[in-house]
Amino acid sequence: MKKQPIVLLLGKLPPPFMGPAIATEILLRSALRDRFRLVHLDTRAHRSLTSMGNWSIRKAFRTLSIYLRMKWLLLRHRPDVVIIPISQSTLGFFKDSLYLWIAKAFFRKVIFHLRGSNFRTWYAASGTINKAYVRWVLRRIQGVIVQGEKLRPIFEGLV
């Protein structure tokens, strides 16, 4: 029997029940399990909708612990590919790009997963330094998953 490729899938899980968390849950329960060995890293740093978007020491430590857990999962499972959902805001993209750098430190292939359609608009409105960083990051990934064919042009000229 052929060994299943190992995929480290990053993403939030409910609660709170919201689009990205539900999408991650659906992926983890999908037929992908028949073709890949899915390993999941819950990237949720908040426990409720009221704490979303608010900074706290507790959330900073939780985020740091998520990065450390990712390192442990990379060492333990040695995934063939890491799938990272990306944000469409400057701070969110920077935070998400740290997952890329951790994966690349372990010589893993990385695929970004965009859940939304605002990336190109955000990128176009970004400053020169931010655009340069985004291009630098996107040159280091193996691809991007979007939610439909019509969204593929979002990354035209970037990936």
Task: Name every feature range the model reports, one short phrase each.
Residues 44-62:
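N-terminal beta-loop-helix "entrance" segment that forms/cooperates
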Residues 57-74:
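Glycine-rich, highly charged phosphate/nucleotide-binding loops
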Residues 66, 81-106:
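An aromatic- and histidine-rich active-site surface loop
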Residues 137-149:
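A short beta-strand/loop micro-motif in the catalytic core of glycosyltransferases
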